Amino acid sequence: MSLDVAAVRGWFDEYFATFEACARGDGDMSELLRHYGVPLIFTSDAGITTLMTDDEAAAMMQGLIDGLRANGYHHTDVLNPEVSVLNAASALYRGTLSRLNADGVEFDRPTVTFLATDDVAGLRIALIAVQGK
């Protein structure tokens, strides 16, 4: 994939659609997991976690999805998305993720920055950084 703003936006649109389907129980977790590279770095105010295997990434994503389901998650509206192509092999995607339940009520609103890298496996997320509050 040639990294340009439109290609990265399109890839993330597909990623969020896959994430939403999995979080609602309508999607296949293996489809979601193909969006993540390993190692995968996750950082937030709670600290830094480096996931070194596919199984570790799967467990973390399952934990996140379980938490969203407990809140009646239905979908995410990405507010103010920004894409910055860093070079031929990587790009940043940043947006505020308005997470809504089936009634359209927002229950979470983190701002998240993703680093996506393009290698022989295609574009994959290498870092997820949740902005502090």
Label each region the model flagged.
Residues 1-35:
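Short, low-complexity N-terminal intrinsically disordered segments enriched in polar/charged residues
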Residues 12-19, 36, 57-64, 97, ...:
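Hydrophobic alpha-helical core bundles mediating ligand binding, dimerization, or RNAP-core interactions
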Residues 18, 47-49, 99:
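Short histidine/acidic/glycine/proline-rich micro-motifs that form metal-
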Residues 29-81:
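A solvent-exposed, acidic/Ser-Thr-rich amphipathic alpha-helical stretch
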Residues 75, 86-97:
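A short hydrophobic beta-strand element
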Residues 99-107:
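Short, cysteine-centered beta-strand-loop-beta hairpins and adjacent loop/turn segments enriched
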